[in-house]
């Protein structure tokens, strides 16, 4: 998968990533960044997040590094379709030789594995950053090291995806709680309205011919709340003069149900 314009592409989901992941440092991300740096003997290991206007770090072994303008981001170039982005000498690569991180910051070596995730159940895979490492001297990177970085990158990708999924699940749970509270408020208002107006509501369960009453119907008929009634028994509460009206309207009501 490739992204022809990483900056423009990231603009479409940058806010969602920041909101879901959060910028607070977490031990599991810090641990993976530190393990990556240690394993390869690099001074800096990081998990970056590339947004439309900046790059920040979910984890980085150098606490003095917080964020940078997206124009200086090396990680965003990892979205060009290659599995890994490895630059053994940044001064010899035209894409990076004039980058302030190289000319002023002294960076010479970069290796990163892009992180692709789904931001929602219907989302396509999108790149959000990279598991990367930096050194201040040029260095070679063997095939075995590439394989190891790929495996670590998959671990980082799974970790980030799990964090996003957890945040989405929490949002869904909060929304369900809100909907339940709204439903309960509506039911309370309906019960209050029934009580004030002196009427009740009921419905027929077609599966077993059982009638479900609102609280006010129980009060009107002066029977214990919660007592279940079959349709035949429920109809016995009506005056004989009204039964013909009920029997006439009932088939019409049932046939008008939309499925």
What are these regions (language model features)?
Residues 247-259:
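Single conserved hydrophobic/aromatic residue that forms the stacking wall/gate
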Residues 1, 187-238:
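PAS-family sensory domain signal
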Residues 1-71, 204:
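Intrinsically disordered, low-complexity terminal regulatory regions
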